Protein backbone atom coordinates (compact mmCIF):
# COMPACT_ATOMS: atom_id res chain seq x y z
CA UNK A 1 0.00 0.00 0.00
CA UNK A 2 1.30 3.43 -0.95
CA UNK A 3 1.78 5.95 1.85
CA UNK A 4 0.99 9.51 0.75
CA UNK A 5 1.73 12.75 2.57
CA UNK A 6 0.79 15.96 0.80
CA UNK A 7 1.71 19.62 1.22
CA UNK A 8 4.68 19.22 3.52
CA UNK A 9 6.29 22.66 3.82
CA UNK A 10 9.86 22.96 2.58
CA UNK A 11 11.28 26.47 2.44
CA UNK A 12 12.57 27.63 -0.92
CA UNK A 13 14.12 30.85 -2.19
CA UNK A 14 13.95 33.65 0.42
CA UNK A 15 12.30 31.14 2.80
CA UNK A 16 9.13 31.15 0.71
CA UNK A 17 7.20 27.93 1.48
CA UNK A 18 6.91 25.18 -1.12
CA UNK A 19 4.13 22.60 -0.81
CA UNK A 20 5.78 19.19 -1.22
CA UNK A 21 4.28 15.71 -1.63
CA UNK A 22 5.87 12.32 -0.94
CA UNK A 23 4.68 8.87 -2.09
CA UNK A 24 6.24 5.50 -1.15
CA UNK A 25 5.53 1.93 -0.09
CA UNK A 26 6.27 1.78 3.63
CA UNK A 27 7.80 -1.69 3.78
CA UNK A 28 10.88 -0.65 5.76
CA UNK A 29 13.23 -0.93 2.79
CA UNK A 30 15.23 2.02 1.50
CA UNK A 31 14.30 3.04 -2.02
CA UNK A 32 15.64 5.20 -4.84
CA UNK A 33 14.00 8.62 -4.95
CA UNK A 34 12.59 10.53 -7.91
CA UNK A 35 12.11 14.29 -7.63
CA UNK A 36 9.71 15.84 -10.15
CA UNK A 37 10.01 19.46 -11.31
CA UNK A 38 6.93 20.93 -13.01
CA UNK A 39 6.99 23.36 -15.91
CA UNK A 40 6.14 26.99 -16.63
CA UNK A 41 2.56 27.86 -15.71
CA UNK A 42 2.27 24.49 -14.00
CA UNK A 43 2.05 23.05 -10.49
CA UNK A 44 2.68 19.73 -8.78
CA UNK A 45 -0.94 18.54 -8.88
CA UNK A 46 -1.69 19.52 -12.48
CA UNK A 47 -3.89 16.91 -14.21
CA UNK A 48 -4.15 14.79 -11.05
CA UNK A 49 -0.43 14.05 -11.02
CA UNK A 50 -1.01 11.86 -7.96
CA UNK A 51 -1.85 9.03 -10.38
CA UNK A 52 1.66 9.19 -11.82
CA UNK A 53 3.23 9.59 -8.37
CA UNK A 54 1.44 6.48 -7.08
CA UNK A 55 2.63 4.48 -10.07
CA UNK A 56 6.24 5.37 -9.30
CA UNK A 57 5.72 4.43 -5.66
CA UNK A 58 4.14 1.11 -6.62
CA UNK A 59 7.16 0.43 -8.84
CA UNK A 60 9.46 0.78 -5.83
CA UNK A 61 10.48 4.43 -5.81
CA UNK A 62 10.03 7.23 -3.33
CA UNK A 63 8.38 9.92 -5.45
CA UNK A 64 8.53 13.60 -4.49
CA UNK A 65 6.82 16.47 -6.27
CA UNK A 66 6.65 20.10 -5.21
CA UNK A 67 5.50 23.56 -6.19
CA UNK A 68 8.30 25.98 -6.98
CA UNK A 69 8.27 28.85 -4.49
CA UNK A 70 7.32 31.47 -7.09
CA UNK A 71 5.02 29.46 -9.37
CA UNK A 72 2.01 31.54 -8.32
CA UNK A 73 0.35 28.99 -6.05
CA UNK A 74 0.42 28.92 -2.25
CA UNK A 75 0.41 26.03 0.25
CA UNK A 76 -3.18 27.01 1.10
CA UNK A 77 -4.22 27.05 -2.59
CA UNK A 78 -1.84 24.61 -4.31
CA UNK A 79 -3.87 24.40 -7.53
CA UNK A 80 -4.76 28.08 -7.93
CA UNK A 81 -2.64 30.93 -9.26
CA UNK A 82 -3.49 33.23 -6.38
CA UNK A 83 -0.06 34.83 -5.87
CA UNK A 84 0.53 36.60 -9.17
CA UNK A 85 3.16 38.88 -7.68
CA UNK A 86 5.31 35.83 -6.92
CA UNK A 87 4.65 34.45 -10.40
CA UNK A 88 5.82 37.71 -11.94
CA UNK A 89 9.03 37.64 -9.95
CA UNK A 90 9.92 34.05 -10.75
CA UNK A 91 13.06 33.25 -12.71
CA UNK A 92 15.40 30.39 -13.55
CA UNK A 93 17.93 30.97 -10.80
CA UNK A 94 15.16 31.09 -8.18
CA UNK A 95 13.92 27.73 -9.44
CA UNK A 96 17.43 26.28 -9.35
CA UNK A 97 17.72 27.37 -5.73
CA UNK A 98 14.27 25.92 -4.98
CA UNK A 99 15.24 22.55 -6.44
CA UNK A 100 18.46 22.65 -4.45
CA UNK A 101 16.46 23.17 -1.25
CA UNK A 102 14.28 20.16 -2.11
CA UNK A 103 17.34 17.96 -2.70
CA UNK A 104 18.87 19.21 0.55
CA UNK A 105 15.64 18.39 2.40
CA UNK A 106 15.51 14.90 0.89
CA UNK A 107 19.03 14.24 2.23
CA UNK A 108 18.55 16.02 5.57
CA UNK A 109 17.82 14.61 9.00
CA UNK A 110 15.02 17.20 9.08
CA UNK A 111 13.18 15.01 6.57
CA UNK A 112 11.04 12.61 8.65
CA UNK A 113 10.93 10.19 5.70
CA UNK A 114 14.69 9.94 5.23
CA UNK A 115 14.64 6.42 6.70
CA UNK A 116 12.97 5.13 3.54
CA UNK A 117 15.20 7.02 1.05
CA UNK A 118 18.44 5.82 -0.51
CA UNK A 119 20.14 9.21 -0.73
CA UNK A 120 22.83 7.68 -2.96
CA UNK A 121 20.20 7.07 -5.65
CA UNK A 122 18.47 10.36 -6.49
CA UNK A 123 16.91 10.96 -9.92
CA UNK A 124 15.42 14.13 -11.34
CA UNK A 125 12.41 14.18 -13.68
CA UNK A 126 11.56 17.55 -15.21
CA UNK A 127 8.76 18.61 -17.52
CA UNK A 128 9.14 21.50 -19.99
CA UNK A 129 10.77 24.43 -18.15
CA UNK A 130 11.31 22.04 -15.24
CA UNK A 131 13.25 19.85 -17.64
CA UNK A 132 15.70 22.65 -18.31
CA UNK A 133 16.03 23.32 -14.58
CA UNK A 134 16.65 19.61 -13.96
CA UNK A 135 19.34 19.46 -16.66
CA UNK A 136 21.26 22.35 -15.13
CA UNK A 137 20.87 21.03 -11.59
CA UNK A 138 22.07 17.56 -12.63
CA UNK A 139 25.18 19.14 -14.14
CA UNK A 140 25.79 21.09 -10.93
CA UNK A 141 24.94 18.55 -8.22
CA UNK A 142 26.86 15.28 -7.88
CA UNK A 143 24.07 13.83 -5.72
CA UNK A 144 21.93 13.34 -8.84
CA UNK A 145 22.46 9.89 -10.35
CA UNK A 146 19.89 9.88 -13.20
CA UNK A 147 18.07 12.49 -15.27
CA UNK A 148 14.79 12.20 -17.19
CA UNK A 149 13.31 15.04 -19.23
CA UNK A 150 9.71 15.19 -20.41
CA UNK A 151 9.09 17.71 -23.22
CA UNK A 152 12.06 19.75 -22.05
CA UNK A 153 13.15 23.14 -23.27
CA UNK A 154 16.66 23.38 -24.75
CA UNK A 155 17.32 27.01 -23.79
CA UNK A 156 16.29 29.12 -20.81
CA UNK A 157 14.17 31.60 -22.75
CA UNK A 158 10.63 30.56 -21.80
CA UNK A 159 8.32 32.30 -22.56
CA UNK A 160 10.04 35.27 -24.18
CA UNK A 161 12.44 33.52 -26.54
CA UNK A 162 10.43 34.17 -29.71
CA UNK A 163 9.12 37.62 -28.87
CA UNK A 164 9.78 40.27 -31.56
CA UNK A 165 12.08 43.22 -30.87
CA UNK A 166 9.12 45.58 -30.45
CA UNK A 167 7.66 43.46 -27.66
CA UNK A 168 11.05 43.07 -25.98
CA UNK A 169 11.55 46.84 -26.09
CA UNK A 170 8.10 47.41 -24.63
CA UNK A 171 8.84 44.88 -21.89
CA UNK A 172 12.02 46.75 -20.99
CA UNK A 173 10.22 50.10 -21.05
CA UNK A 174 7.21 49.11 -18.93
CA UNK A 175 8.92 46.51 -16.76
CA UNK A 176 6.12 43.98 -17.19
CA UNK A 177 4.46 41.88 -19.88
CA UNK A 178 1.51 39.55 -19.48
CA UNK A 179 1.09 35.89 -20.38
CA UNK A 180 -2.53 34.78 -20.82
CA UNK A 181 -3.27 31.48 -19.14
CA UNK A 182 -5.35 29.61 -21.69
CA UNK A 183 -7.15 27.57 -19.03
CA UNK A 184 -8.00 30.26 -16.46
CA UNK A 185 -7.83 33.32 -18.74
CA UNK A 186 -5.70 35.03 -16.10
CA UNK A 187 -3.23 37.67 -17.24
CA UNK A 188 -0.04 36.36 -15.63
CA UNK A 189 2.58 39.10 -15.07
CA UNK A 190 6.15 38.59 -16.19
CA UNK A 191 8.45 41.23 -14.76
CA UNK A 192 11.49 42.27 -16.78
CA UNK A 193 13.72 40.80 -14.08
CA UNK A 194 13.14 37.41 -15.77
CA UNK A 195 15.16 38.56 -18.78
CA UNK A 196 17.69 40.42 -16.63
CA UNK A 197 18.26 37.29 -14.55
CA UNK A 198 18.91 35.32 -17.73
CA UNK A 199 21.45 37.83 -19.01
CA UNK A 200 23.16 38.04 -15.62
CA UNK A 201 23.49 34.25 -15.37
CA UNK A 202 23.66 33.37 -19.06
CA UNK A 203 26.66 31.07 -18.68
CA UNK A 204 25.08 29.10 -15.85
CA UNK A 205 21.75 28.91 -17.69
CA UNK A 206 23.28 27.46 -20.86
CA UNK A 207 21.45 24.14 -21.22
CA UNK A 208 23.68 23.03 -24.09
CA UNK A 209 26.79 23.32 -21.94
CA UNK A 210 25.03 21.75 -18.96
CA UNK A 211 23.74 18.63 -20.69
CA UNK A 212 27.02 18.17 -22.55
CA UNK A 213 28.84 17.95 -19.23
CA UNK A 214 26.50 15.43 -17.56
CA UNK A 215 28.14 12.09 -16.73
CA UNK A 216 25.05 10.23 -15.46
CA UNK A 217 22.40 8.32 -17.48
CA UNK A 218 19.89 10.55 -19.31
CA UNK A 219 16.50 9.75 -20.85
CA UNK A 220 14.89 12.33 -23.16
CA UNK A 221 11.13 11.94 -23.70
CA UNK A 222 9.16 14.16 -26.08
CA UNK A 223 6.07 14.28 -28.29
CA UNK A 224 6.40 14.72 -32.02
CA UNK A 225 3.31 16.97 -32.12
CA UNK A 226 4.37 19.24 -29.27
CA UNK A 227 3.37 22.79 -30.25
CA UNK A 228 4.59 24.47 -27.05
CA UNK A 229 8.12 23.04 -27.07
CA UNK A 230 8.66 21.48 -30.52
CA UNK A 231 10.38 18.11 -30.71
CA UNK A 232 13.43 19.70 -32.33
CA UNK A 233 14.38 20.69 -28.77
CA UNK A 234 14.68 17.01 -27.87
CA UNK A 235 16.90 16.37 -30.87
CA UNK A 236 19.10 19.27 -29.81
CA UNK A 237 19.46 17.77 -26.34
CA UNK A 238 20.26 14.34 -27.78
CA UNK A 239 22.88 15.84 -30.10
CA UNK A 240 24.55 17.61 -27.19
CA UNK A 241 24.44 14.47 -25.02
CA UNK A 242 25.01 11.55 -27.42
CA UNK A 243 24.92 8.98 -24.62
CA UNK A 244 21.30 9.87 -23.79
CA UNK A 245 18.44 7.53 -24.60
CA UNK A 246 15.52 9.07 -26.48
CA UNK A 247 11.82 8.18 -26.57
CA UNK A 248 9.36 9.99 -28.84
CA UNK A 249 5.58 9.52 -28.76
CA UNK A 250 2.82 10.89 -30.97
CA UNK A 251 1.08 13.38 -28.72
CA UNK A 252 1.15 16.96 -27.44
CA UNK A 253 3.18 18.91 -24.89
CA UNK A 254 1.48 17.24 -21.91
CA UNK A 255 1.24 13.73 -23.38
CA UNK A 256 -2.52 13.83 -23.80
CA UNK A 257 -3.49 15.07 -20.34
CA UNK A 258 -5.72 18.00 -19.38
CA UNK A 259 -6.49 19.81 -16.14
CA UNK A 260 -8.59 18.93 -14.30
CA UNK A 261 -8.08 15.23 -14.96
CA UNK A 262 -11.09 13.34 -13.58
CA UNK A 263 -10.28 9.81 -14.72
CA UNK A 264 -8.37 7.11 -12.82
CA UNK A 265 -6.19 6.15 -15.79
CA UNK A 266 -3.63 7.89 -18.00
CA UNK A 267 -3.83 8.63 -21.72
CA UNK A 268 -1.77 6.23 -23.83
CA UNK A 269 1.06 8.69 -24.56
CA UNK A 270 1.52 9.51 -20.87
CA UNK A 271 1.30 5.81 -20.01
CA UNK A 272 4.01 5.02 -22.55
CA UNK A 273 6.29 7.78 -21.25
CA UNK A 274 5.70 6.67 -17.66
CA UNK A 275 6.56 3.06 -18.45
CA UNK A 276 9.70 4.05 -20.35
CA UNK A 277 10.78 6.25 -17.44
CA UNK A 278 10.23 3.54 -14.82
CA UNK A 279 12.08 1.01 -16.99
CA UNK A 280 14.98 3.42 -17.47
CA UNK A 281 15.30 4.15 -13.75
CA UNK A 282 14.85 0.56 -12.56
Which role does the model predict for each range below?
Residues 225-229, 253:
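Acidic catalytic loop of the alpha/beta-hydrolase fold
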Residues 213-215, 219-222, 226:
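Short beta-strand/loop motif that positions the catalytic acidic residue
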Residues 27-73, 77:
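Short, surface-exposed "cap/lid" segments of acyl-processing enzymes
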Residues 251, 255-282:
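Catalytic active-site module of serine/aspartate enzymes centered on a nucleophile-bearing elbow/loop
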Residues 49, 216, 229-239:
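Short alpha-helix in the alpha/beta-hydrolase fold that links the catalytic acid
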Residues 1-29:
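N-terminal cap/lid segment of alpha/beta-hydrolase-fold proteins
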Residues 104-168:
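Primarily recognizes the serine-hydrolase "nucleophile elbow" in alpha/beta-hydrolase
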Residues 85-113:
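Alpha/beta-hydrolase active-site loop
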